[in-house]
Regions:
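Flexible loop/hinge segments that line or gate small-molecule binding clefts
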Residues: 99-139, 150, 157, 163, ...
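Hinge/cleft segment of the Venus flytrap/periplasmic-binding protein
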Residues: 161-169, 180-181, 270-319
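Hydrophobic alpha-helical segments within soluble ligand-binding/sensing domains
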Residues: 77, 133-158, 171-172, 201-203, ...
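Structural recognition of the beta-strand scaffold that forms the well-ordered cores
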Residues: 36-38, 66-68, 93-95, 115-120, ...
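Hydrophobic alpha-helical
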Residues: 94-110, 177, 191, 195-256
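Extracytoplasmic "Venus flytrap"
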Residues: 34-61, 65-83, 87-89, 95-99, ...
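Short, low-complexity disordered leader/linker segments with a strong preference
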Residues: 1-34, 107-114, 319
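Short, solvent-exposed amphipathic alpha-helices that sit
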Residues: 46-63, 140-144, 168-187, 201, ...
């Protein structure tokens, strides 16, 4: 009888162990840690690349990742943060809508013990982010400004189209550009207006400015979407070739336009580099590392007709 009981118990134990092992394995798959990727807008190809590159790197590192679109709306961004903090995410890779306003959301995450890593756009509130991975916009626009001066022969009338007035990048780019261009008396800025980094708004701004100032020789735009919008307005006005267009970002359509001789130059940012760096640092933080840099600058490179063959897909071809 004792032997019969033993024969019955052993298979039961084995079956239990197998069941436990299977459920534990399935449980571990279901409970994969999550990282949130919050992007200011997905209505711009550059930011789509930034967001998707971050998601892809998180998945490569073994996390589930969710992409959130703030639609350039601070209220939408705040709503995303509320949902993220209530849902148990381990980290947030963040492209803010506003340098000042977005700090409140990042600070709330920090208080909740959820680390925030900023990509491309800066937050002014101290202690809100673990690390901010940012393009060196100021230096990049110094380089672009020098090429602008050279291309213009040190003289001419130009327009500046700014991005979002609440974004530090807008002013860093403008200051870098003017730190060079303002040294040349022959170069005169006849208008400066913002178009919120939006292609359609930039087209409308350029149409209006050309009517008020028919003698424009160039336009400097704070990003490539606006540069393409300005070019569309110039083309529609029959002034293609008469007004030089300069952008900033390194978006594919602008790089292709440089190849075709439609755009003079842009500043190549590297969204993939920033996204991969942010995801890698978040992974290190989750695993216990705390000795991480507060800021990481990413160099910007000038792209023009002389070197455009080396660039594509939001970066260098050899990357």
């Amino acid at each position: 009888m004792k032997r019969i009981i033993q024969h019955l118990i052993i298979p039961v134990i084995l079956l239990y162990a197998m069941t436990c092992n299977t459920s534990c394995t399935n449980g571990s798959k279901e409970k994969k840690e999550r990282i949130a990727v919050v992007i200011s807008t997905l209505n711009n190809p550059w930011f789509v690349v930034l967001g998707q590159s971050a998601v892809d790197k998180c998945k490569e590192l073994g996390y589930d990742a969710t992409l959130f679109d703030s639609q350039n709306n601070p209220s939408k961004e705040a709503e995303h943060f509320d949902n993220i903090l209530a849902s148990g995410y381990k980290a947030i890779l963040f492209n803010p809508t506003d340098a000042d306003g977005s700090g409140v959301n990042a600070k709330a995450a920090a208080r909740a013990g959820v680390p925030v890593f900023c990509m491309d756009r800066e937050i002014n509130l101290p202690g809100a982010c673990v690390t901010q991975i940012l393009s060196d916009n100021y230096s990049g626009c110094i380089t672009l400004g020098k090429y602008f001066v050279e291309s213009m022969g040190k003289k001419g009338n130009y327009v500046e189209i700014l991005g979002l007035v609440g974004d530090n990048n807008t002013w860093a780019r403008s200051r870098g550009f003017h730190s060079v261009v303002d040294c040349y008396e022959g170069l005169k800025m006849v208008a400066q207006q913002n178009a919120d980094f939006d292609q359609n708004k930039a087209m409308e701004v350029m149409e209006s400015v050309m009517q008020a100032h028919p003698d424009i020789d160039a336009v400097f735009c704070g990003n490539d979407a606006m540069a393409m919008g300005a070019y569309q307005a110039i083309l529609a006005a029959g002034k293609d070739g008469d007004i030089k267009v300069f952008g900033f970002d390194g978006a594919n359509d602008c790089v292709n336009a440089i190849r075709e001789g439609k755009i003079e130059a842009t500043g190549m940012q590297f969204p993939k580099t920033m996204a991969i760096t942010a995801a890698t640092l978040a992974d290190k933080y989750i695993k216990g590392e705390r000795n991480l840099p507060k800021k990481l600058p990413v160099a910007v490179e000038l792209v023009n007709k002389e070197n455009v063959k080396n660039y594509g897909d939001f970066g260098r071809i050899d990357q």
